[in-house]
Design a protein with these regions (language model features):
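A shared catalytic/ligand-binding motif for oxyanion handling
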Residues: 1-120
Length: 120
């Protein structure tokens, strides 16, 4: 693993990623921030559209998306780390995704989007 003594994780509520310009700007931002893990909330992508969300150097991308253009979360794992995935859990409402895996010892990463009470 090519990381130091820390694991950098960033998170961002993107409020929709259906436009190509916004997806491109997000990819550039992620590359500039250069974290090991990036969690996105409210991507509003349908399962058939998740292939559009790509970032160079990030092949491990996990989604929880439903059939409506709302909610949706994703976790990106940088190619710079060797994360061995042991389990992935998603909810049906597209509000969370949980990845359990190991780098040097066992870690769990959870990405949760909790909308306002009235939005449920």
């Amino acid at each position: 693993m090519a990381m130091g003594s820390y694991l950098s994780i960033i998170t961002l509520n993107v409020n929709g990623l259906n436009g190509p310009t916004k997806r491109q700007r997000l990819a550039e931002w992620i590359q500039k921030q250069d974290p090991y893990i990036c969690c996105l909330q409210e991507n509003h992508l349908k399962p058939r559209d998740t292939y559009r969300l790509k970032v160079k150097g990030w092949k491990k991308i996990f989604h929880a998306n439903g059939n409506q253009k709302k909610a949706g979360v994703a976790i990106f794992i940088s190619d710079k780390i060797n994360l061995e995935i042991k389990a992935v859990k998603r909810d049906k409402e597209e509000h969370y995704i949980m990845i359990k895996g190991s780098i040097q010892e066992e870690d769990t990463t959870i990405n949760i989007y909790a909308p306002n009470i009235g939005a449920l």
